[in-house]
Amino acid sequence: MRLAIQLAAATRGQTSPNPVVGAVIVKNHQIVGMGAHLKAGEPHAEIHALNMAGEKSKGATMYVTLEPCAHYGRTPPCVEALIQAGVARVVVAATDPDERVSGRGIEMIKSAGIEVIQGILEQEALELNEPFFYSVTEKQPFVTLKIASSLDGKIATCTGESKWITGEESREDVHFLRHTHDAILVGVNTVIADDPTLNTRLPGGGKNPIRIILDHHLRTPIQAKMISDNLAPVWIVTSPACDVNQQKEFEKRGVKLIKMDETPIRIKSLLEVLFKEGIQSLLVEGGGVVNDSFLRSGLFNQVVVYLAPLLIGSQSAPSSFSGLGIESLEHAARLTFKNIESIGNDLKITAVRK
């Protein structure tokens, strides 16, 4: 099962809207087949493993990180393939919360006389697909707030200089973080100040997430890099009252305008809209104002902070969170440290909501 989890982990960022899944087939104490789900619409991990094992699948044990699917989607049900192959035992790490599966796969396997063992390395399997599980059950995206700051919580100097607070190694790690999310969200002030591309620059490539700009008054410069680079779709969340001609200029360039008649835009409403648009995981790379909006809404799942060993000072220097903030410690967002690691000269701190 540990190997199956490793196979699944290697595909993070590639399979959305499907979960990452790994499978290993063992017979007579030898691995005879293995596989991972590589991309939505392509064969699932179980099918790759069965194809590799061939006739050796009969009487073998399959270890799989997620309950095999029992429904017809882009591909046929994996349960039927397992039964037809004559697998004798299926060891499942975690059940699938998708209402189309949700225990049905396991019941179908048992009904065919195949032994099923559940819960092996379950916690590791759950963590591997945390955004998928959350979005399926809560009907909204899994939200990660990403922050790069000095020790005193500053994200730029008082003159606006921010390149670069963190080191090169941290910035490279951010590209993998982007790769594992469906979309990146920033505020229009970040676009105006930094003109970012928000793409993924990994060795050997990587997935470029959808880029979302919060821009109620449609102030995004038409000449901004991401508007014309064609690296990934750009969505602008704006007001339906914005200038019609300006809207047409963006639409001519392939920009999707999501019009929300709220001032300011409520984070809950935004997440509901994004979920309906197919976004399961959202990486927020906004400035202090956008971060503060998510903080006050309480609608975020984890925070990833890249902390550089420098002090900037100045009351006027932008902070990780700005705006009204939380008035009482009683209402402060309580988190738990999940992981702390050194990356170059920086610290990467991952904290999750309690």
Question: Where do the PLM segments sit?
Answer:
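Enzymes that bind and transform nitrogen-containing heteroaromatic metabolites
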Residues: M1-R2, L7-R12, S16-N18, M34, ...
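Solvent-exposed, charged/polar functional surfaces in cytosolic regulatory/catalytic domains
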Residues: L7-A10, M52, P131
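Proteins enriched for Cys/Gly/acidic motifs involved in redox and nucleic-acid/cofactor modification
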Residues: G13-P17, G41-E42, I106, I120-A148
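N-terminal glycine-rich anion-binding loops that anchor highly charged ligand groups
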Residues: T15-H29
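Short, flexible segments with low predicted structural confidence
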Residues: V21, E80-L82, S149
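Zn2+-dependent cytidine deaminase-like catalytic core
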Residues: I25-E124, I210, N230, W235, ...
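Generic structural signal for helix capping and beta-alpha/helix-loop junctions
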Residues: E99-R100, L126, N291, G313
